[in-house]
Amino acid sequence: GENWKDVPDNKLFVIDLTTNPPAQIATVEVGKQPSGLSINKAGNLALVANRADNSISVLSISGKDVKLIDTVPMGEQVAHVVFTPDGKRALVAKFPGHKIGVLDVDGQKVTDTKHNMNVGLWPYNVDVTPNGALALTADNGNSGASDGNVDTVSVIDLEATPPRVIDRVVVGDAPEGLTISPKGNLAAVV
């Protein structure tokens, strides 16, 4: 109804997957409207994209202990974040800016490089091939709503210095989900 008001939360729930059934063991306060989450391969660092706070939360992971250790301001709304396989960089989907940003990761220190790549309209998701050579973005096209038009997946060359967009592939309307297979030879976009 007309009295409904959208109020973004700031909670991240920590789930213990070793119990049967899995159980919530902690709640960590991050930025407003946590949207995308990525954990590095070492399992000791997580990044959270906070849409309503225009920031990335940096969390340390030690066993079952998860702590907020830093917040990186991004200057605009971010929808998703993903580590590169080597854990030295992360890519950030800057949803309304139609860009992918690059973060440097040095241990637990995360910094915005200020390098942005123009991709298709409204990038909502980003993933990296297992070898770290390419990244793909799901370019939603219309701020989350279907508009009946085809949209794109942008292809980013991560081996270039600096990384750059090298292609766009036309896909169906309003892609949000995107994943790359463990071998890196297939991608699924929904």
Regions found by a protein language model. Give the residues of each.
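Predominantly soluble domains enriched in secretory-pathway, periplasmic, or organellar proteins
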Residues: 1-190
